[in-house]
Amino acid sequence: FGRNKDVTCEECHETYQVGASDELDDDGFLVRRIEESVCPNCRNPNKILKLPVFKGDRILVNKFTYQVGNPQRWDVIVFRYPEDMQKNYIKRLVGLPGETIRIGRGDVYARQGDQGEFEILRKQNPEKQKLLQLLVYDDRHAPVDLLAKGFPERWTPMARENAPPQNATEPVPSTDPVPPAKPIDGWVRDEKSWKHDPATRSFTIEAGVEATKWVRYQHLVPSQSDWKDLAAANELPYQARPQLITDFCGYNTYTGGRSFNMDDDRFWVGDLTLNCTVEINSITPASATGSPNPELILELTEGVRHYVCRINAATGLATLLRNDELAADASVADITMATAPTPIRGTGKYTLSFANVDDRLCLWVNSTWMSSGLIPFGSGAEFTPPANRNPQASDLTPAGFAVQGLGARVSDLVLQRDIYYRAESVANDAGDFSSHEPELVDSSRIRESLTDPLEYGARYSKNANEAMFNALGPDEFFVMGDNSPRSQDSRLWPNSRRHAVNRHAVPRNALLGKAFFIYWPHGIPFLNSGRGFPVINHTPARDRNGPLVETYPDYAAPFYPQWWRWKRIR
């Protein structure tokens, strides 16, 4: 992190960081104060004016790595900023010498030179991919007060609207007081299978249910006006509607500072990771259910594709499948992509992560700091994306889990998304930002379409640009930041001083080394209600009338180190 504040949401208690660099001018003087930030989990606006501020993490840099070897794609590197060699930058290395880089729909592609086909640049090590995922929703930190006042749950037992009736027992009373107004892509609430316990944030189902029973996620996101309405009237004046998952970034979303307003999250993200804990309590014999296998099923949708992982709870065999989007009949069997054994064997407690990221499916089972837990599907888990890349109605319920012939309890539901690299660029000439090309030519109404995937897709296709950068030279590299909406990186560097042939390139002689370890995350103040005692205050900028803003502590003591954040940089 750079200069930031640590925030614990007042409503859902999710902890997150918010950037605070906008409080300072280019000379380091305090010019404005960050006032509110928006929780990435529940969107509650949190008052942060009086929270302490922290400098960026201190890292170890291996300066010898690139003296004896070449940089590797996705390394985190430290280098001299090409436009001002007195400044050091830290970014992730994306493009290698000789490559032409293209960015589109949140993904990065490369080809050698000016010829050949572009290939997606996925993280070859899935562990690195896993570490880079960003929070969409953590059900362990649900906004319980908001839900109690009528806002709908995001995870809901659901069934296909015209599914045949099952031999379930009495309906389970709903814990969600606001039923969906109409089916979502043919899905309706199912009160006859999973039982939701809002106190433990878990779902339970008894063995013996014949059909596959689903719990699905809907991206029901409260707005800041929702929070204000609830505070004023204790109820919502309208029905909440699911929307597409976007590239919302809590680190950038605040009021105050030099930016004046909050970042606009307007780009659909279809690359998701579903995490959960599954406790299998009982298995119904196949002969009793009429099904060949007792199964645990995970599903992620992205546009016209549905990606499924079916795990045989008796044998542990996992099978990856996808639908055939070109089939005229929806009843056509799914396409088997790959199979692999897993540690799942009968009853027991298992942690699972299922990811669809960068045109590849990944599954982790019982991952710990000592063991990866990655299931080896091989190249069969990789795929070519469909021709139609636009979102569909199914993306309003983009993740789900189900069981068949099992008694189970599912908890610790966390949905994440991949980094969305925005396709922004600047013309490759000498100059500053006069020729800036945004990803969307007209973004004025794109957010209005987030609840209508087909309309969103039509507007995006009509107004979207891809960003393409000239082929890198033999000793040049392309870098980007993980915080794509705000990152000052190869996409947008000025070229007024150096007049480089490739304004987007980092020359080899500017590389300082590979960042490999966070050895000093910022300390945590204690005493004085957790704020410590001021040691040094900020220096506020001044005009003829005096300071522009009231100062506050820049350093406080005593403090203790965040030893749990001492870690290798991946």
Q: What does each model-identified segment do?
A:
Residues F1-R570:
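Extended hydrophobic leader/signal-anchor segments used for secretion and membrane insertion
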